[in-house]
Amino acid sequence: IGYTPWNDNFPADKLPEIYRISEPEKAVGSYVFEPSNGYVAIEAEHYFKAVNAPETEWTCIPYMGRTLSGMALMPYTKNTDGAALSYKMKLPEGVTKVTVRVVVKSTLAFRNLDGHRYNVALDGGEAVTVNFNSDLNEKPENIYSVFYPTVASRVVEKKVELDVPASEDGTHILTLSPLDPGIVFEKIVVDFGGYKPSYLFMNESPSKREL
């Protein structure tokens, strides 16, 4: 609320009307993103749908990401079979290929020493498997070139090239599926020509929720 003079003679002060959600814990997901300047940037917390593995639950960790939060399947002691986060977006007509940048927390390979993996797929197509921390260790060939810089930056960014299937309404669903525990997703950027490298991985794109 702004004022020009301090002697406004208001007949009454009125509190703006407040609308409360009856079950706020259920008011999650269902985000649909619009492209902005050649890319779609999404905070991991703003998923369209989350599927849990048996005895697990997708958990939002506030402030873990550089810009908002992180999403992790917990507890880490359980298997990740069947778990997934899906992100719904619209892409412009004529886009046939995208570069998907997935930003995760710099988790060490505590469960699988060969590295922790996740799958990336678009519209149910063939998934691409990403091993994001196989070289995140103190071996002589990695400690100065990979380990120390990654520990300092606290994130791991990986890129995946995907074909874009035809869509009648331009809507597409990107799915991230953890194959190992301990993966914390922070941000996803779907680039079709407009991405510019930045510390915050671009501003989040416009979105609305399907209720």
Can you annotate each of these PLM segments?
Residues I1-L211:
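Extracytoplasmic
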